[in-house]
Amino acid sequence: MTAIAPVITIDGPSGAGKGTLCKAMAEALQWHLLDSGAIYRVLALAALHHHVDVASEDALVPLASHLDVRFISTNGNLEVILEGEDVSGEIRTQEVANAASQVAAFPRVREALLRRQRAFRELPGLIADGRDMGTVVFPDAPVKIFLDASSEERAHRRMLQLQEKGFSVNFERLLAEIKERDDRDRNRAVAPLVPAADALVLDSTTLSIEQVIEKALQYARQKLALA
């Protein structure tokens, strides 16, 4: 009988630190990694590369079903590999973002990508980062973590990130945007942002990233009986 690969799901709102935690855990455990937030951007970029109409659901479904994408974390840096090519920077362009919002609107595309995400489940295990990983994509995952932080703390972190890149930012505007996104995510009809019933809710508001990683790894190893 083939062993089923264990999955650790990391869900939570924007800016809680999911990506950083996901990369750290994948490196510590030497497991595979899935950044579900990037999947729609990767599909949009693949469509642009292959001249597939991003407004055609029929054309997008087969592309989504066989999307050749991998995520590799090295020293805290995430590489997004599409068809053997590093597209980490390319998926962040405005053109790709616009196309991603189009492809994400199609139900059959979302269903195809759901199956594609589940295919990331390979031995020795998978760390899955998203918003509905523990509730929709991998409801049977043995370890589920819901990483949260106050909206003020998440706005503060985002402000520091943008300032480091040389952008001038308004804290109140950032905070309003985060609260608006939270409200939209938590109240949407399909796959709302809520912790799975069996998830560890980890509030990172007053914790350093090192403390978050330590707590998450300790919990995962305990649940999985890993050395």
UniProtKB/Swiss-Prot annotation:
It catalyses: CMP + ATP = CDP + ADP; dCMP + ATP = dCDP + ADP. One of its GO terms (molecular function) is CMP kinase activity. The keyword Nucleotide-binding applies. Disulfide bonds: none annotated. It comes from the Bacteria. Keywords: ATP-binding, Cytoplasm, Kinase, Nucleotide-binding, Transferase. Signal peptide: none annotated. It is found in: Cytoplasm. CDD domains: CMPK. Gene3D superfamilies: P-loop containing nucleotide triphosphate hydrolases. ATP binds at G12, P13, S14, G15, A16, G17, K18, G19, T20. GO terms for biological process: nucleobase-containing small molecule interconversion; pyrimidine nucleotide metabolic process. GO terms for cellular component: cytosol. InterPro entries: Cytidylate_kin (IPR003136), Cytidylate_kinase_dom (IPR011994), P-loop_NTPase (IPR027417). Its EC number is 2.7.4.25. HAMAP family: Cytidyl_kinase_type1. Belongs to the cytidylate kinase family. Type 1 subfamily. This is Cytidylate kinase. It comes from Escherichia fergusonii (strain ATCC 35469 / DSM 13698 / CCUG 18766 / IAM 14443 / JCM 21226 / LMG 7866 / NBRC 102419 / NCTC 12128 / CDC 0568-73). The gene is cmk.
